[in-house]
């Protein structure tokens, strides 16, 4: 993600918003 809090796997895997 872009705004990933924990994992930023491009498209957000865990916490993103």
UniProtKB/Swiss-Prot annotation:
Cellular component, GO, one term: extracellular region
Keywords, ordered alphabetically: Disulfide bond, Ion channel impairing toxin, Neurotoxin, Secreted, Toxin, Voltage-gated sodium channel impairing toxin
Superkingdom in the source lineage: Eukaryota
Tissues of expression: Expressed by the venom gland.
Coiled-coil positions: none
Keyword Lipoprotein (UniProt): no
Main location: secreted
Subcellular localization: Secreted
Molecular function, one GO term: toxin activity
Domain LCN-type CS-alpha/beta residues, every copy: 2-17
Function statement: Alpha toxins bind voltage-independently at site-3 of sodium channels (Nav) and inhibit the inactivation of the activated channels, thereby blocking neuronal transmission. The fraction to which this protein belongs exhibits low toxicity and induces transient paralysis in all insects tested (the crickets A.domesticus).
Domain notes: Has the structural arrangement of an alpha-helix connected to antiparallel beta-sheets by disulfide bonds (CS-alpha/beta).
Family under the similarity heading: Belongs to the long (4 C-C) scorpion toxin superfamily. Sodium channel inhibitor family. Alpha subfamily.
Name the record gives this protein: Toxin Bl-2
Organism: Buthacus leptochelys (Egyptian fat-tailed scorpion)
């Amino acid at each position: 993600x872009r705004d990933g809090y924990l994992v930023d796997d491009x498209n957000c895997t865990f916490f993103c918003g």
